[in-house]
Amino acid sequence: MRVLISGITSFLGISTGKALLKKGHEVYGILRPESRNKERLKGEKGMQLLSLNMESFLLWEKENEIEAEYTNSTTEAGINTERCITTERGITTENNSTTDSHAIDKSISLPSLARLHFDAVLHFAWDGVGSLGRSDIATQEKNLRMSKAFFSWAKAHGVKRFFFAGSQAEMGKGSREEPLPASPYGEKKLAFSEYGLRNHGKMEFIDLRIYSIYGKGDHERSLVKTLVRNTLRGMETELGSGNKIWNFMAEEDFGQALAFLTDLEIQTRGAFTIDICSGESRLLSDYIKEIEQIGFSFLKKKGLRYSGESLLRFGLRPPNVEGDYDFTAHTKELSALGFEERVSFSSGIEELYEFIYETEF
């Protein structure tokens, strides 16, 4: 199967791409022409990276709307979609072909992209995912418009299955069934989710509600990595209350889950929402305490000194923009389809301690 991934250099994009390659799929990833993150994929054999600005799909959508109303409109506007569109608009022609078996990076035009005839698209690209960005209305509105244009492009070019990387933010104060998003980020992600479920036509639309994924590739200031580093250093960690239901899933299991869903035969449902999570949800504070205890055991095993007294300081940090709400995951959906997790929370955290200790200490 030929698969296109937007946001390929993200933590989740990389995890998914690796899992799909292992299953024998052809994997193409979209990244910004100026991306500084493509080094994350260095050495990934078989992955093909395509330099393309996601805003290009907005231009494609605009051109197609014009063509529907006026004859020869692209000629009148001075736009030639078969040749190079200026790099200011975010597209360059194909070049830099290579026979390197590692990740291939080349620029591509939209017509050339269409000729690759993708079977599935996994859409991770979404700006403003940090706390400040989630509150930025303009950024989140732009994300929504670009996502709709990308969706329309995929639908128009025969893509069979479109995956959207949603999150808990769409639920906010509510639930998956009755969402009440608490931020512009959650509102716009929910808006695209609903748009895809309504307008997918013959293209299958899988609305992924992704819970907290942890692992080696997670961003450096994530809660889990911060806890691991602080435990190794014997430093205190200031935290929120931790009194909310949470769910953690290992990055290896996440990638495998997406590869599983990509291969899944869908008999009766052309579009549906599914939670991507582990089989267990519990209080966030319980997870946090377990991470610290695993760290103490790790330090003892290494023969390193530690006090044994908890360095967790709950109740000192305010909630983020999403608020301090329970996120109750549908923990049985993936297993009901036949997916099996391989990494327990304890073993995943032990591996992360080993990785961070070996690479940073």
Give the ranges of each region predicted by the language model.
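Conserved Rossmann-fold NAD(P)-dependent oxidoreductase catalytic core, especially the SDR/UDP-sugar
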Residues: 121-123, 127, 148-184, 206
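C-terminal substrate-binding subdomain of Rossmann-fold SDR/epimerase-dehydratase oxidoreductases
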Residues: 235, 239-243, 247-361
